[in-house]
């Protein structure tokens, strides 16, 4: 390629991004974010915060604004900093609504309780019915706003070419520390890490990611504040510009090296948690493990059976599933899969960290799952191994922990309304009639029927300690609706389940600082049944085992256990309920000024999110320059893209070769649509990258994207353009010139339900089918047509290993059929990327076995050691054939070998493949260069793993 053409390619590259939508449609995968309903956005304004909400979340928005302003004042004082710009808060009444947000480019996972976005400093968060959790998240995210503001202030005051990043444990740990600190679940994780000897050093923790970093970071910040003073936090942000990296800055500000402070922190943690060993015993000693990687167990015994079968959620295969196994005399049988989840729209999510299962006496499993826009209650027949019923309810977006009535005619569950409030509901079968049992702002969870069906016990934050996260057990009289305390105290009593055998309620409580199992009778007299140093949840009494089935946490993993109370674990009876109780708490923020504020309608206003530009100069030949700009509104529903470039040579002016693209995308509804206009001029290449042509064109286009479900969608593009084209090699493309109006249409069907590791997909299936047609309107003929199919299947062979299969087919025709190239490291390894393995007909098969080689990889650089995620190995076989109508006698080309996959930033990988070429039939018609005719080859690749 000449330098002139290189400059031309730089100039038109920006414009090609927009007009190349057909290529994106052919090769694009990914799951869908669906806007099931439109939101009528409104804005409440405080002193520092702009609160964006919709009418269903109006009351919640006022609570959010009041507490955000209160938190701002607290953080302003503690961090001695004022954020100079207004802070946008976008609040959603449920996580189901939050999953539709366009502020993030991906679907927020259920564990994501809030996010602070960098470009606009926006905070977005959902309400899940838990007031204390919500307040914690508000302050946590506001800490991130202050962190970004402090960083921006220092960057403006002391600009540097390179600014290093603070480690995740520092930033998230500070947000946790300044929010509320560790709760009992955080303590459970920290205790487990400390007692198991897995506590990392601060240097090692720098390379850790995931949820476990949050409590560890919070504990580190607490230790640093208590030992060295909280004032050093602000010093870190204001003086970090002086130092080359975090370790040097830390040593200067704290007066000791990171390694020394790491030893001090680990000793502090051991002093904190080692004494608990004298007060309890691990689950490995006190209980029998029934299942690994399992949570939310429930036991069911068929009338004719002497042993129970335990049902539970398990992600052992990557996807969440419902499993079952028999339990008899303390032992467990083989696991079987009952319901497969997270593969289709019917069982999109089981909410297995927050929702329980239940089984009726005749073997019908009741559970909830996300089904399109909201949750559904599913009834699964064990005998028939099929769905027996599915129920959705208007106005209820979330369904948690369904529980059967003793007579099997109804189910009670915890439901979250579209306004964000959590209440108890009862559904009657078979007609699905819904009855509301509670109606207030409190979070009511995990209901369970008494053996006579007259009373429902549940866990709720309606206790006097609820605003700070406390939960107690309550009982509801089904006939009268009266609610009264069953337990009382400043702790968390959770997951009650009423035993139909002894009439007791078995539940979990953290009243001694660790989640233990208790039992309480209808009079409120209880007994502690476990004293473990780990954690125990979701108990159920199994009479034939004379023990308790429960979920436990140990070795950083959840499992299912059975324990028999004995003299060591059964303690003296404890009176759990109080005679006189203080009144329930209320949302104090509703008494504040924001409660009476007037909301203004949201007005769409674009602001700049991203801008970039570049210049290329070839002395004596010419120059090229270009820039791109991306704008969006505050909610992220509307995007505006603008690109401009030009190419100037000795024989042309800047204005003569101006290229531009303007594109608007509307993501506010289920049907995403975009319109754009373009003008391009320069040298281009067909899909084979070996057929060059000069073209000057202008026109407009429309793009449509309609998700059928989270896993399936239809994409379409329509383009009308005025084109003047000159083929540089007319024998390859059908003619010397073309000047005409062209209408192009592309339609694609895409499915993707894959699971990913850092190095690429490991389970599931993804495929796309695309058809395209370009009409020459000026001459009344088909300019070109094409059809493309790409199927990829991933079969897991282990927790981190899989077989990856890819099948590709391509066909094109018309006056100027587009050729495809299947050579190179992305398709057919060991063969040239350009010019040779091209044609208008093609098929390709890839088979690769991927397996882990190392968990982590540390590389030493002159500036220090860097630790990266583990290396993956691979063994592969490729086989493909590409031809045209005039070269139909070509044989197939193949390659086999092994390689290594090195993850950088997911999904980008470095890939090194070494192998051997082989061929079938007549391969000489490809005209391969000499270096591609030898047997051995080495391929190096940077990009995405198929």
Predicted regions and their residues:
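Repeated loop/turn-to-beta-strand initiation elements of outer-membrane beta-barrel proteins
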Residues: 433, 482, 635-640, 668-675, ...
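Beta/coil-rich, acidic/histidine-enriched accessory regions frequently appended to metallopeptidases
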Residues: 28-35, 40-43, 208-211, 235-355
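Transmembrane beta-strands of outer-membrane beta-barrel pores
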Residues: 462, 619, 633, 644-650, ...
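Active-site-proximal alpha-helical
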Residues: 75, 169-170, 174-185, 192-259
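A flexible loop/linker signature enriched in serine peptidases of the S9 family
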Residues: 290-292, 313-324, 341-354, 366-378, ...
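Outer-membrane beta-barrel initiation region
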Residues: 558-559, 564-674, 738-761, 825, ...
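C-terminal outer-membrane beta-barrel translocator/porin domains of Gram-negative envelope proteins
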Residues: 594-597, 688-690, 703, 731-879, ...
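Juxtacatalytic substrate-recognition/specificity segment
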Residues: 26-167, 184-186, 203-206, 249
């Amino acid at each position: 390629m000449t330098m002139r053409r290189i400059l031309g390619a730089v100039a038109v590259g920006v414009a090609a991004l927009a007009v190349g939508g057909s290529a994106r449609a052919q090769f694009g995968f990914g799951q869908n974010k669906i806007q099931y309903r439109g939101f009528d956005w409104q804005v409440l304004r405080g002193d520092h915060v702009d609160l964006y909400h919709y009418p269903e979340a109006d009351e919640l928005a006022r609570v959010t604004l009041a507490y955000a302003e209160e938190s701002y004042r607290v953080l302003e004082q503690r961090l001695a900093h004022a954020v100079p710009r207004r802070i946008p808060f976008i609040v959603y009444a449920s996580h189901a609504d939050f999953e539709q947000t366009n502020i993030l480019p991906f679907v927020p996972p259920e564990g994501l309780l809030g996010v602070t976005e960098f470009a606009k400093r926006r905070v977005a968060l959902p309400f899940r019915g838990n007031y204390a959790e919500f307040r914690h998240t508000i302050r946590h995210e506001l800490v991130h706003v202050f962190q970004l503001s402090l960083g921006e202030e220092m960057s403006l005051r002391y600009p540097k070419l390179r600014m290093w990043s603070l480690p995740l444990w520092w930033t998230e740990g500070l947000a946790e520390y300044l929010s509320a600190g560790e709760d009992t679940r955080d303590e459970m994780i920290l205790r487990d890490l400390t007692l198991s000897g897995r506590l990392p050093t601060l240097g090692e923790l720098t390379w850790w990611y995931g949820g476990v970093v949050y409590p560890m970071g919070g504990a580190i910040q607490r230790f640093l504040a208590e030992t060295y003073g909280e004032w050093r936090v602000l010093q870190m942000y204001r003086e970090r510009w002086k130092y080359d990296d975090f370790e040097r800055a830390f040593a200067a500000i704290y007066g000791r090296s990171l390694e020394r402070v790491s030893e001090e922190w680990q000793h502090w943690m051991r002093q904190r948690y080692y004494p608990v060993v004298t007060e309890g015993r691990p689950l490995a000693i006190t209980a029998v493990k029934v299942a690994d990687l399992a949570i939310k167990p429930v036991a069911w015994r068929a009338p004719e059976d002497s042993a129970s079968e335990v049902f539970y959620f398990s992600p052992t295969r990557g996807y969440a599933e419902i499993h079952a196994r028999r339990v008899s005399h303390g032992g467990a049988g083989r696991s079987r899969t009952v319901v497969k989840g997270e593969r289709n729209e019917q069982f999109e999510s089981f909410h297995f960290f927050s929702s329980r299962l239940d089984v009726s006496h005749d073997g019908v499993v009741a559970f909830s799952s996300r089904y399109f826009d909201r949750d559904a209650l599913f009834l699964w027949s064990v005998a028939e191994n099929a769905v027996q019923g599915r129920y959705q309810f208007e106005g209820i977006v979330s369904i948690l922990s369904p529980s059967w009535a003793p007579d099997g005619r109804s189910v009670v569950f915890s439901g979250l309304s579209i306004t964000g409030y959590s209440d108890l509901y009862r559904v009657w079968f078979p007609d699905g009639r819904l009855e509301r049992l509670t109606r207030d702002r409190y979070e009511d969870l995990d209901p369970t029927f008494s053996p006579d069906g007259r009373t429902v016990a549940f866990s709720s934050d309606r206790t006097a300690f609820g605003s700070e996260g406390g939960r107690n057990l309550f009982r509801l009289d089904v006939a009268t609706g009266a609610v009264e305390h069953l337990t009382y105290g400043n702790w968390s009593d959770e997951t009650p389940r009423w035993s139909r055998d002894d009439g007791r309620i078995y539940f979990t409580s953290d009243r001694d600082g660790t989640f233990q199992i208790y039992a309480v009778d209808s009079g409120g007299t209880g007994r502690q049944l476990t004293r473990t140093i780990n954690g125990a949840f979701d108990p159920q009494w199994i009479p034939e085992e004379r023990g308790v089935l429960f979920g436990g946490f140990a070795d950083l993993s959840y499992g299912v256990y059975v324990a028999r109370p004995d003299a060591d674990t059964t303690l003296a009876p404890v009176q759990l309920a109080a005679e006189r109780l203080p009144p329930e708490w209320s949302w104090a923020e509703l008494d504040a000024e924001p409660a009476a504020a007037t909301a203004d309608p949201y007005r769409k206003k674009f602001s700049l999110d991203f801008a970039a530009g570049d210049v290329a100069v070839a002395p004596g030949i010419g120059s090229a320059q270009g820039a791109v700009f991306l704008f969006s509104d505050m909610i992220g529903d509307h995007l505006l893209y603008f690109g401009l470039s030009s190419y100037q040579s000795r024989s042309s002016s800047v204005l003569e070769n101006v290229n531009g693209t303007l594109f608007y995308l509307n993501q506010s509804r289920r049907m995403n649509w975009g319109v754009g206009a373009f003008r391009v001029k320069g040298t281009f290449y067909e899909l084979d990258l070996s057929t060059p042509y000069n073209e000057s064109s202008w026109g407009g286009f429309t793009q449509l994207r309609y998700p059928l479900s989270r896993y399936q969608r239809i994409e379409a593009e329509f383009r009308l353009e005025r084109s003047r084209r000159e083929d540089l090699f007319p024998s390859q493309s059908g003619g010397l010139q073309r000047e005409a109006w062209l209408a192009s249409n592309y339609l694609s069907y895409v499915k993707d339900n894959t699971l990913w590791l850092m190095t690429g997909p490991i389970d599931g299936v993804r495929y796309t089918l695309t058809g395209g047609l370009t009409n020459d309107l000026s001459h009344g003929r088909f300019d070109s047509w094409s059809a493309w199919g790409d199927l990829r299947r991933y079969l897991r062979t282990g927790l981190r290993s899989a077989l990856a299969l890819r099948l590709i087919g391509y066909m094109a025709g018309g006056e100027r059929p587009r050729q495809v190239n299947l050579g190179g490291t992305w398709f057919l390894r060991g063969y040239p990327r350009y010019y040779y393995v091209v044609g208008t007909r093609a098929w390709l098969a890839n088979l690769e076995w991927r397996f882990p080689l190392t968990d982590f990889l540390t590389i030493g650089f002159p500036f220090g050691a860097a630790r990266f995620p583990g290396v993956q190995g691979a063994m592969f076989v490729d086989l493909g054939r590409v031809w045209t109508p005039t070269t139909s006698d070509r044989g197939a080309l193949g390659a086999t070998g092994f390689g290594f996959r090195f993850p950088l930033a997911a999904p980008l990988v470095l890939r090194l493949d070494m192998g051997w070429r082989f061929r079938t039939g007549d391969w000489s018609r490809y005209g391969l260069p000499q270096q591609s005719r030898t047997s051995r080859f080495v391929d190096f690749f940077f990009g995405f793993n198929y």
